[in-house]
């Protein structure tokens, strides 16, 4: 067992060095879904000398990954020093992340750290700016439990059936967490 901040080594048999790169995530098969869109809560540093504007190009860092992205501000025109906001990051490459993962963003040029935050939704749909329902959904995802997130995903699928395995992949939760939350939601009558 290892913890954040520790260095570890893993022996991966039958894997060639060119098949993996810095930032790859080691996870059980079909437990995560690669994404190039992220819904996040972004906090700009008090010490930042710059203001984040819509469609700013940024360097995104999480774990050992570094990816270029565009920041679409969902609830504000700009985010200044010491402020925070809901942002959809549109990545230039796909990565695998989980809800709750922390990240850091830096300006594209000059490469100065602007802030960081937490991933609220690892597999969102493209969102439009200044939509009340979008902001409400992100507020629920920020303050809610994993059961709330599952309920939102089930609602988004409407009349179609979605399996627990697919919910686990979409939410990047473990199958056990999903099964427990689905049982709780069924008992409440939230989902059927």
Predicted regions: what is each one?
Residues 2, 14-192:
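C-terminal effector modules of nucleic-acid-centric enzymes and ribosome-associated factors
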Residues 4-8:
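Membrane-interface junctions of multi-pass transporters
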Residues 11:
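NTP-handling and nucleic-acid-processing catalytic cores
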């Amino acid at each position: 067992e290892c913890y954040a901040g520790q260095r570890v080594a893993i022996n991966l048999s039958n894997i060639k060095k060119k098949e993996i790169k810095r930032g790859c995530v080691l996870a059980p098969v079909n437990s995560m879904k690669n994404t190039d869109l992220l819904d996040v809560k972004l906090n700009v540093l008090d010490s930042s000398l710059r203001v984040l504007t819509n469609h700013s190009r940024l360097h995104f860092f999480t774990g050992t990954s570094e990816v270029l992205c565009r920041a679409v501000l969902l609830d504000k025109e700009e985010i200044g020093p010491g402020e925070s906001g809901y942002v959809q990051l549109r990545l230039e490459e796909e990565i695998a992340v989980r809800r709750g993962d922390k990240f850091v963003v830096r300006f594209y040029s000059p490469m100065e750290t602007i802030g960081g935050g937490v991933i609220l939704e690892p597999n969102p749909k493209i969102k439009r700016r200044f939509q009340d329902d979008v902001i409400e959904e992100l507020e629920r995802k920020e303050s809610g439990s994993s059961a709330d997130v599952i309920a939102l995903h089930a609602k988004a699928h409407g009349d179609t059936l979605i399996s627990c395995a697919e919910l686990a992949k979409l939410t990047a939760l473990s199958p056990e967490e999903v099964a427990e939350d689905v049982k709780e939601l069924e008992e409440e009558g939230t989902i059927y």
